[in-house]
């Protein structure tokens, strides 16, 4: 009889226990996101230079301090980032600290890349004040319409760039129209304050204005860009990007810089400064194959570039100066040539027309987190080019290994044929935490 009662009580007690437990069930509240974030990025970079000792830039740079046929360069950098959110306000900080053991000298550099406060009084309005990165344009290798962008490295998209000191206003509005779905306006005010704020734009006290009108029209992203100020040409630009299919997208940019300065140098070393309206434009495509290979191709017309004859004169002057120095031993000749050509070599590309192509393959042979690639940049006027094979590998979380080799190819008197390196392997490791 006791066994019978025992078997009857067990399911009753289990049911009662379950019912009682249900009365005390409670939902575990979701963890609130932290109002702050901190991050660090460490990078070690090694570069091997195999010099072209006959190239004009090498002769001008190292005639008074010959490094030999090759040299090693090492860089180590730390980037510290932080963010804070308090209601509708957000603050961000990004600092860059780099030590370089170069071919001729060593140096330590400390820069504030970003440091700004952002206020969002409504979902449609954002106000920024401070130093913030400006990344406009749709081009991959070039951005002719992005007048405020810092020069970027198309083969290193994760590279952080220094921002601009500004006061910014962003307005965004979603629409329900059939054609126009979104519209946005960005207005930037950029002051020049002595050496620490936008000094590369103009003189102390100058004030610059930039606008970008964004439209999402028939599934096409369009930007209309304006930039003007006392020390820069008035500039007008437009860019677009559109997905034609899930695996193919097109993009383009066009820009007009009005009354822009243009410096030329002839075979005798005489310089002339002209003013002209410079049209630049870019058209590109991005294609993803069924085997996860990505192909990017771009054509770029550089309105500020030089025709083939102008480049011939530019390199002929340097060759003449080098011959005079070799025959007379007068170093003042090369010092003068180095000073006169410095502004030209500060330009990323000297020519008029370029073609860029990059092919990357995701995880070939089932090697996880490994992407090899190859890129080529061709000067379509003198047919010299730069070939760059490389790879990116992420062997573990937050660790990235990169390798690339720059190989400039072309005869003397051409843009890439006169590069100071015959080839330049480069490897860098990044660790995030």
Q: Which residues make up each language-model segment?
A:
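Membrane-embedded beta-strand positions of outer-membrane beta-barrel proteins
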Residues: 40-42, 93, 129, 169, ...
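Transmembrane beta-strands of outer-membrane beta-barrel pores
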Residues: 44-52, 86-88, 95-101, 133-135, ...
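Residues that define the transmembrane beta-barrel architecture of outer-membrane proteins
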Residues: 70-76, 108-113, 161-165, 205-209, ...
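Outer membrane beta-barrel
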Residues: 76, 81-184, 188-190, 215, ...
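Repeated loop/turn-to-beta-strand initiation elements of outer-membrane beta-barrel proteins
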Residues: 87-93, 124-127, 176-185, 217-224, ...
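Extracellular/periplasmic loop regions
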Residues: 237, 249-366, 374-376, 416-418
